[in-house]
Every structure is written in C-alpha cells, then in structure tokens.
Amino acid sequence: MSVSAFNRRWAAVILEALTRHGVRHICIAPGSRSTPLTLAAAENSAFIHHTHFDERGLGHLALGLAKVSKQPVAVIVTSGTAVANLYPALIEAGLTGEKLILLTADRPPELIDCGANQAIRQPGMFASHPTHSISLPRPTQDIPARWLVSTIDHALGTLHAGGVHINCPFAEPLYGEMDDTGLSWQQRLGDWWQDDKPWLREAPSLESEKQRDWFFWRQKRGVVVAGRMSAEEGKKVALWAQTLGWPLIGDVLSQTGQPLPCADLWLGNAKATSELQQAQIVVQLGSSLTGKRLLQWQASCEPEEYWIVDDIEGRLDPAHHRGRRLIANIADWLELHPAEKRQPWCVEIPRLAEQAMQAVIARRDAFGEAQLAHRISDYLPEQGQLFVGNSLVVRLIDALSQLPAGYPVYSNRGASGIDGLLSTAAGVQRASGKPTLAIVGDLSALYDLNALALLRQVSAPLVLIVVNNNGGQIFSLLPTPQSERERFYLMPQNVHFEHAAAMFELKYHRPQNWQELETAFADAWRTPTTTVIEMVVNDTDGAQTLQQLQAQVSHL
C-alpha cells in the first residue's frame, strides 16, 4: 500500500466535495505537509488557482475574492505557524460574512507534543471564530469515503457566513508515484464523481419574515441608517427611504449615494440631533458603521423601535436598543416591506447636509488627504470599483465625500484592522476583473508591503493610492497624550514607496498637485497594470481639516 497515493485520493475527495458547494477560487501557499491537498487542487479543473508565499496575505486574498464572488473560497496551507497566519482573515470573515474554507495540513497525532518539527496543536486553535471546525483523522481506508464527503458536506451545507476550519493530518511519505492504492475506496462513491451535487444536501434557511405591523410603522416618523451592503441593495435602500420620506444616513460602504452627505459633520449640529429625536422608529439596514458621530447618535437615540436588518447572524447593536434583530437578506426584506409614498418629515437636516457639503467644497483646492477624500468620486474608474482602507482614510471619505449610488465599494470594516488591506484589494480585483481604485495609508501599505507581489498580475487597471502622512494620524483625532503621541502612537517611519514599487516592477507616480495626480490617473487607466500613486501630504493637515469642518458645521 502506498501512503502517498492514498493521501492524495483522500485529499481528492475533500477537494471535489468543495466544488459541489460553489468553491471556484482556491488559494495555495507553499508547503510540504500540504502536498496531498495542493496536488489534488492542481488536478481539479474546476478551480481557479491563486498562490502567495505569505499565509497572512493569502488569507486576505481569499477574503477579497469571497467579498466579490459571494461564494466560499478555499485556502490551503501547511502545518505550524502557517496556520496561525490565517487568523486575521478568519476573524474578519466572521464579522463581515464572507465564506472561507481553511484546509490546514497537519502532522499525524503521534508527532504532536513530542518535539517533532513544525508540529503544533492545530485542532481548535481558532477557538470560537470558525462557524464550523472539523478535525479529520489520519487518512485510512478503514473509514468509508462516504463518511468523509458527508462530513465536509454537513459543514459547508450549513455555512451561511464566516469560516470553516478543516484540519487535515497526513503521514509521510508525502511524495511518490500514483498507483491503485485506494482506488476502490474512492470508487465506492459511485456516480457522485460524475455528478455536480453534494453527497449530503442541507439548505440553510434564510427566509425573510414579514413584520405584520409594518403597515403601522411605515406611517410614522422614521430614520433609515444604511451600513455595509451590496451595490444593488444600496440603490434599493435609497429609493425605499426616499419613498417613505425618511432621512437616510448612509455609511461610506452603503452604496446608497448618501443623499444626505457629510453626515459625520452635520450630526455634530444640535439642530440635526434635535430633529432626529422626533423619530419614532429607526431602521438600520446593514452593519459596520464608520462615522464616530453616527455611532454616537446611534448609541444615544431612543426611538420607540430600533430595527436592525442584516443577513449576518448575531448581535449587531453595541447600544443594545429595544427593538428587533431581523436576520434577512436586505433586498428580500425590502420587498416584503414596501414603502408607502409620504412627504419628508425632516426639514433642517437636508439644509444642514447641503451647507456641510458647501463647507467641504470651499476647502477642496489645497493638495491634501482631506481634499482627496472629498474628490475621490472624481477619480473612480468607469464600470469599476473602490477599495477603501481603514484608520483615517475611511473616516475622511465617509465624512467628506459623496459616492455614486450603486458604485461598488469594498473594505475590511469588521475588525477594522490595517493588516492585509493590499492583499484583500488584490482579491477584490481578481474576482471581479474590474478596474479598481484602492486607497490606504502609509502604515497600512507598510504592514502588507509584500502583497505588492500579488498586484503584478491584474486583469484590469488597478491604482493603489498610498496617502503618506508619515504615521498613524488617526491618533491625532484622539486625546492621546501629547508628549507620547509621536513615539508611541503615530510612529512615523519617514519612508517613501518608490523603491517598493520598483522592486515589484509596478508603475509609480508621486504627484505634487492635482493636475499631476489627474495626469497619473489618466495614464494608469489606459493599461491593465498596477500603478502606485504615493500622495505625500503634511502630517496632521487631514485630521485638522476634519476637526475644523466638524467645528464649523456644528455652529451652522
């Protein structure tokens, strides 16, 4: 009997089972212990293969692929700390709803806790973060193939969001020629190999339930808060709120067109919050709200009812309102709860939103990151998409810009870390094939710098804007101790990215004014390559501009 041959047959069943659940993209890191999985994936023509040498980046690449494809994405890594590097992407997927399937190769049980090389305790290492965890046994013909395939099917068939961890121990030898070992074991699955359906079919129910008193609440004074959702959902939510005559407070990830722009400015005005106090119901569609003042208002508002609609399970209200947590697809829920045409009940807020936008426009000429955030909609590629980083950049865009309704926007706003942002953007571009504008800060770019390797091969133009304000200037907005701020919070690195771009043979521009930036964009959108645009700005100007605008609008 050939151990290596049976390892591969065992792995082939696992990989084939994944295809029955919509897995098309598979991300593979180099490793020896994962050889059976890697070779099985390579031999399966149903997969689109992606490779990367950094497992942390690989996990985020898979995350980006899953964001756009809306399908589960598989990841293969070897044993040891390679597995631990998948933790950040798994955590993010659990919070934002992407489906990841982590296939982690492992040493067999007799090599654990005995000093064997690259052997750690992998079963259960992700604690409660996976939706489902499977610790497979060492491959053996004593276990029928139908057990293996039905075990995989059960985990994936009930997967609605988040990650599945499948730990796969393999004994040596890992290499060798294929023979007939295990062929009859495989063939006991019969015509399943020619079919395209799971062996065990389980359909998770996510049917929207109609709220029978909706006809009553839709006649009241309401507010719509729009969080993260798809582009199509964003357009539907905007129309729904407009028909109801309810003010819509749209997050940067809502893709609603933000009909009341600059919410994080005007929510600091007492006239706005006073008017919002008249709301009898708040309906929040989508989660992951960005703006600080929106979150402050959301925490303090006390309507008669607060409804949260999202297809992600679990609690999504840190303010613990009295109301309803409705687990449903947003578009389906809107269809079950049609709007009734009514006149807008808010008078002050539309006026304040317009005045706030005019205040932002009055400052748009200076060459800075706040102004870039405001202008970002001018630079979006046609039929393209936007990927927004975390920290200061997403807050500036949320507060100062007005993105087009239905324009795809992606970000990692679950745990809101700055790790893996470039890798995630690479996955977003690969899955869609669309022109992509990605914008991150300098520390975020440094954190995931080796992901520039993933940007060498793109199917459409990709522009990566690195806003270099020399450190984590988000901390300039926080009451961090002045004497310790630079050393322990901002951590300026005094670097530029020209040589990083050159290392990976990417085009690079460092514009000094708006005209040079626009010229760089015009050049970048012409060819299906990656262009790095480094925008060097004064360290604290962006944070200061935001603070000044917030103060100005609060006194309108």
UniProtKB/Swiss-Prot annotation:
One of its GO terms (biological process) is menaquinone biosynthetic process. Disulfide bonds: none annotated. Its EC number is 2.2.1.9. GO terms for molecular function: 2-succinyl-5-enolpyruvyl-6-hydroxy-3-cyclohexene-1-carboxylic-acid synthase activity; magnesium ion binding; manganese ion binding; thiamine pyrophosphate binding. Keywords: Magnesium, Manganese, Menaquinone biosynthesis, Metal-binding, Thiamine pyrophosphate, Transferase. Binds 1 thiamine pyrophosphate per subunit. Pfam families: TPP_enzyme_C (PF02775), TPP_enzyme_M_2 (PF16582), TPP_enzyme_N (PF02776). The keyword Nucleotide-binding does not apply. InterPro entries: MenaQ_synth_MenD, MenD_middle, THDP-binding, Thiamin_PyroP_enz_TPP-bd_dom, TPP_enzyme_TPP-bd. Catalyzes the thiamine diphosphate-dependent decarboxylation of 2-oxoglutarate and the subsequent addition of the resulting succinic semialdehyde-thiamine pyrophosphate anion to isochorismate to yield 2-succinyl-5-enolpyruvyl-6-hydroxy-3-cyclohexene-1-carboxylate (SEPHCHC). NCBIfam families: menD. Belongs to the TPP enzyme family. MenD subfamily. This is 2-succinyl-5-enolpyruvyl-6-hydroxy-3-cyclohexene-1-carboxylate synthase. It comes from Shigella boydii serotype 18 (strain CDC 3083-94 / BS512).
